[in-house]
Amino acid sequence: MYRELTRRGLIRDTDLIETVFTVGESEYQRLKSITGGDWEAVLTTAGSALTERDAQRIAGFGRILADFLISPLDVPDEARETVLELGAMMNLWVATFDRLLDAGTNPDDIHSSYGVRAAFMRNSAVDRAYERLVPPARRAIYRLLSAHAHAIDDLPHTDARRHIRQDIDDCFSEMHQKGRELWYKPWSAEADKITSINAIAILGLPGWLATPNYGQSRYQDHIDWMEGVGWLFGLIDDTADLSEDATTESNNAVQTQLATNSDRVVIERIADKTERLFTELTEMTTHTDCELRPEDVFSGTINSWLTPDMA
């Protein structure tokens, strides 16, 4: 896979990982402060599945990926900063949920569907009541989601575009529900795909509450592209995990494709998808106020999975 993507000019040498850790350190400290001192309970529960260095990298990637995903949008500086902070927050939330599942924690002991509904009420009294009912690790995770929901409401165009706020809530709820299904039920390719797609789309959707320029067709085109990126990143992640997943007998979407197709067919299929999304990115992106070149983030993120020593 790496050789084919390199041959097509889709893998580039960048110093993305260095930047990820630089921005991730400050984002991680900010997010820890939101949890009110309960974050240590999360790390204790996760054990080796989530270290502080992991969390810094995850927060940094969340910020950088949000910047990449909203690159086609014209977002003023102050609102852009909020969207990037939301990206760091949500990426850490999603990864923490996944890592705690990997550590053997029941999903409802991490964050229940009731907790999702409580956070989305965006009511400080509800927040305080819920936080009194749960142990420290769950309280920390709840506070991150509640802070995300409140910050979404503070974006400049939320009141005028309530349907987009609802799309964000629905995107998260579906991702959370499918994540629970993957724990409680036999592995489902559909549920696996939805969690991959939504984990990326939810980083970029807030940009549409921050940009003054909105059009329904552009909005849908952007969603379609983000969903494509989410599914591609899921496939690249599974490509990197092929050997480990085979050893542990874990489910893997790429291995599922390899069961009925040759290596060459699967590689070319994924490479074609990568090339198409890269082309669509260059066609959509007209703004130059990103912290990093969007093309470098796209390529560097893929590279970070396929050459894990970078991380």
Residue ranges and their predicted role:
Residues 1-15:
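Extreme N-terminal leader/anchor segments
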Residues 9, 20-22:
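Peripheral, non-catalytic segments of secretory and membrane proteins
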Residues 23, 27-69, 80-87, 93, ...:
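All-alpha helical catalytic cores of prenyl diphosphate-utilizing isoprenoid enzymes
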Residues 68, 99, 103, 238, ...:
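Generic, well-ordered alpha-helical scaffold segments in large soluble proteins
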Residues 71-77, 90-129, 249-252, 256:
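Aspartate-rich (DDxxD/NDxxD/DxxxD) Mg2+/diphosphate-binding motifs
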Residues 105-109, 244-247, 251, 286-294:
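Structured alpha-helical bundle/scaffold domains in large eukaryotic membrane-trafficking regulators
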Residues 219-279:
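Active-site/pore-lining binding-face segments in mid-to-C-terminal subdomains
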Residues 261-310:
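C-terminal structured domain segments
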